[in-house]
């Protein structure tokens, strides 16, 4: 079983907006080298934060409307949601410390 959740148009509202946990959403594409570099770290964070934070992935090629909805122009883009609201975002490859810090801030705010 994969540690991350695949998100699409059909399950975005349920898995992200109505989640009772903070959600980190990774907008990525199969052809994106930096996205592939970030993926193993996100999988690790998903396992380590299981039960506290949900880590989800949106393939922008398969879900262009979701990418457009959030103005995704560069990937990878990480969106941080809590209580159904977008609370923060990062664009490009970021380090583990940055991701965990942003997750901690939104978890405390909920």
Question: Can you name each region flagged by the protein language model?
Answer:
Residues 3, 8, 28, 54-56:
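Conserved Rossmann-like nucleotide-binding pocket used by diverse enzymes
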């Amino acid at each position: 079983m994969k540690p991350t959740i695949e998100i699409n148009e059909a399950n975005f509202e349920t898995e992200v907006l109505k989640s009772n946990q903070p959600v980190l959403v990774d907008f990525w594409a199969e052809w994106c080298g930096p996205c592939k570099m970030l993926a193993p770290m996100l999988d690790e964070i998903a396992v380590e934060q299981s039960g506290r934070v949900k880590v989800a992935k949106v393939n922008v090629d398969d879900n262009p409307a979701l990418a457009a909805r959030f103005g995704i122009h560069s990937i990878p883009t990480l969106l941080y949601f809590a209580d159904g609201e977008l609370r923060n975002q990062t664009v490009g490859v970021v380090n583990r410390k940055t991701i965990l810090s942003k997750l901690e801030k939104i978890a405390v705010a909920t």
